């Protein structure tokens, strides 16, 4: 993965617009949060292979970035993204990591279902 270049990510987001895609969205404080301080609560949200069609996509901010995908029924939104890549399967993979390198958020878009 490399640091987000807004124009490149915006172009990638637009390539998937107006057709069915699969979304992976994950955010986590990780179990390490409670492990390091038992008063901290572990917080996780995880969605894999949600099939959606979005009609508008925007990347905003100056880093970390936020991405919004406008669907017919509402929005998919991810904030805290710092890196991205388009892999050999043409999937757009975006992530945000905490200063120590631990994953904080991931938003991935694919034309095919992700492996489970």
Swiss-Prot record:
Superkingdom, natural source:
Bacteria
A Pfam family annotated for this chain is DUF1806
Q: Which InterPro entries match?
A: DUF1806, YojF_sf
Q: Which residues form a coiled coil?
A: none
Disulfide bonds, which pairs? none
What is the protein named? Uncharacterized protein YojF
Q: Which gene encodes it?
A: yojF
């Amino acid at each position: 993965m490399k640091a987000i270049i807004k124009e490149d990510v915006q172009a990638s987001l637009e390539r998937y617009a107006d057709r069915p895609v699969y979304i992976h969205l994950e955010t986590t404080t990780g179990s390490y949060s409670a492990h390091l301080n038992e008063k901290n609560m572990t917080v996780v949200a995880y969605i894999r292979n949600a099939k959606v069609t979005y009609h508008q996509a925007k990347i905003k901010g100056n880093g970390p970035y936020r991405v919004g995908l406008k669907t017919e029924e509402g929005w998919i939104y991810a904030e805290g993204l710092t890196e991205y890549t388009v892999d050999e399967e043409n999937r757009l993979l975006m992530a945000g990591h905490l200063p120590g390198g631990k994953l904080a958020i991931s938003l991935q878009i694919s034309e095919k279902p992700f492996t489970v």
